[in-house]
């Protein structure tokens, strides 16, 4: 079985080695056909504490790492402008 992947935005980095990633899922309503947007928040493992709030990241499914963590950061797709200023 293939591992699931999601792309989302980091919304919290206040925990050690953990970030909260918000993934937006868009789909048409079954009756009204209006595009509905649902946001799901995943806790993901960030071993190096490299992610900052606003970063676009790809997360992959992994074994359970704690009570709520079942995802890990695969790669940082783009950094937020705030994160780039802090690293310089």
UniProtKB/Swiss-Prot annotation:
Signal peptide: none annotated. One of its GO terms (molecular function) is structural constituent of ribosome. Gene3D superfamilies: Nucleic acid-binding proteins. Belongs to the universal ribosomal protein uS17 family. This is Small ribosomal subunit protein uS17. Pfam families: Ribosomal_S17. GO terms for cellular component: cytosolic small ribosomal subunit. The lineage of its organism: Bacteria, Bacillati, Cyanobacteriota, Cyanophyceae, Synechococcales. Part of the 30S ribosomal subunit. Keywords: Ribonucleoprotein, Ribosomal protein, RNA-binding, rRNA-binding. It comes from the Bacteria. PANTHER family: 40S RIBOSOMAL PROTEIN S11 FAMILY MEMBER, SMALL RIBOSOMAL SUBUNIT PROTEIN US17M. One of the primary rRNA binding proteins, it binds specifically to the 5'-end of 16S ribosomal RNA. GO terms for biological process: translation.
């Amino acid at each position: 079985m293939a591992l699931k992947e999601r792309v989302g935005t980091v919304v919290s980095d206040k925990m050690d080695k953990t970030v909260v990633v918000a993934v937006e899922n868009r789909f048409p309503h079954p009756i009204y056909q209006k595009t509905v947007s649902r946001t799901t928040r995943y806790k993901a493992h960030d071993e190096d504490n490299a992610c900052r709030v606003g970063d676009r990241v790809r997360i992959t499914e992994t074994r359970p790492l704690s009570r709520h963590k079942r995802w890990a950061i695969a790669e940082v797709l783009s950094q937020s402008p705030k994160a780039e200023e802090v690293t310089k």
